[in-house]
Amino acid sequence: MKTLIIYASKTGTTEKCASILNKNLKDSTMINLSRIQNEDIDKYDIIIIGTPIRMGIIDKRVKKFISKNYNILKNKKTAYFICCGFNENWKQYYDQNFSKELLDNAIIYDTFGGDLNIDKQKGLNKFIVKMVSKSMDKNRKIELLNKNINNFIENIKEVNNPY
């Protein structure tokens, strides 16, 4: 089965996660929405969409892609991942940003965690990350959730090879 991994990334975390998926899934293609917008998604059997979360909102390029391709996506095998620093809110982020129809039909949707690196931020985002960092519990870790990523990969592989 042909798999499309389509994503948007602000600081590289979502791209890193998309690359992990691409390396672990056979016959997969990875596309960054900041570079390509007009891929024929109909030729893929599984479509995986990844996005960062900023202040509870998905990337505008992902939102536009989903809106433009909604009728195709609702009839395809899909999976979604988000990268965010506040993993305890991940279900809320999905409920606020994705339709119930898409989530109900998804193979899996999950959070892959995040990275709060101030050096990768720019402008207002840099200021916000500094403020959030100061107000956070010092023991709180913001990191990629390898267990979630591996579980996600296994769920996709089961659909690719059901026997």
For the regions a language model picked out, list residue spans one by one.
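A short, aliphatic-rich alpha-helical micro-motif
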Residues: 41-42, 73
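FMN-binding flavodoxin-like domain, especially the glycine-rich phosphate-binding loop
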Residues: 24-27, 55-163
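Structured loop/turn residues at beta-strand edges in well-structured enzyme cores
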Residues: 1, 42, 104
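Surface-exposed, flexible loop/turn segments at secondary-structure boundaries
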Residues: 11, 36-38, 86, 117
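N-terminal beta1-alpha1 ligand-phosphate binding loop
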Residues: 2-25
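A short beta-strand-loop structural module common to alpha/beta enzyme folds
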Residues: 27-38, 84
